[in-house]
Amino acid sequence: MNSGDSSLIDAVIYNHTLCDGWTNSTEGAIYHLGNTILFLGYMGGSGAYGALYIFSFLAPAFLCLALWGWLTMCGLDVFIWNLLLMLQCLAQVCHLIFRLMRDGLANEEFSALYTAVYLPLDVPVQVFKEITGAGENKVLSLAAEETYAVEGKTPIDQLSFLLSGRIRVSLEGQFLHYIFPHQFLDSPEWESLRPAEEGNFQVTLTAETDCRYISWRRRRLYLLLSKDRYIARLFSVMLGSDIADKLYSLNDKLFAKSGVRLDIRLPSLYHVLAPSPPGSEGGSASSPPRGSLGDPTVIKVDPAPSNPGSGTRNPQPDQGKNPVPKNPHQHWSSDTEMPSGEDSTSLILEDFADMTGSLMDYGHEREYLK
């Protein structure tokens, strides 16, 4: 450290006039009012509205301090600095108000929704305003364990989009999957009905935590989609992606112990997931034949040869000359007539006997999270 720096430090620390004594008098009311408003201003939160709150309080606070410096302290420097700070706060307030009016977003939740979902899709702000306006720019709430829809009772008359929280989806008390933020609550129900049709929910939706969501009435949203093709295509893409995510969330729960994942679209899994008809032992006595058109979830499979040595690579000599055509309408008379002597349901259940993580294994969502 050179001598110049040391002399400056000594001048700051030692070469100054000490206070002879503390005065018992206090500053005027304007000074204390300014500091009180300043204290309240720094209690604002984050985000655009939090900044608007802070600068709206700081501007009158610095105005009071500027008046205090002009009237009480009679100090030009005190007055000028506080006046400059007040002008800067007013400029920030004007900028924030202009930005909020330009964006046209009703609250902070809509702003976060636009930034997270619609901005990556290059959706203009004006289009987003039309979409939220169709839902009356309202954000609805669900308390924990409050029911959004009950299976077989709640009509399908709206479409909702989750902003925060978590929704539990169940069927007859059996947990299916969760709905997370930025997902539709009832996209499958929306796509299952035509505009003129009516129906009820087939699943129960319950709030796992405190939730916030926006909702559109069915008729009003259909009117918007019929008028604007861009919004209609946007909703078509978002709904299709949401339904695919829900299907994959169910599909991810089906996996075997060996690590091989099973596809929920496999026809053979229908017997595992679907309840057996009452009064039937294996679920096959009252089921239609495998080749019938009434069961689209079951496909016809040719039986495996009983002799492992007689495969397609070793045909009989006479079969090469006079091949016997197969009847395309041939099917098993019932599920009990299988080559192995077992009914189809028992065969499928044995195939998936070691399966863990299926839909039938989770009695509660806490087990699903383990």
Curated annotation (Swiss-Prot):
Keywords: cAMP, cAMP-binding, Cell membrane, Membrane, Nucleotide-binding, Transmembrane, Transmembrane helix. Residues 275-349 are annotated as: Disordered. The keyword Cell membrane applies. One of its GO terms (biological process) is cardiac conduction. It is a multi-pass membrane protein. Important for striated muscle differentiation and cardiac morphogenesis. Is also required for cardiac conduction system development, plays a regulatory function in heart rate dynamics mediated, at least in part, through cAMP-binding. This is Popeye domain-containing 2. The lineage of its organism: Eukaryota, Metazoa, Chordata, Craniata, Vertebrata. The gene is popdc2.
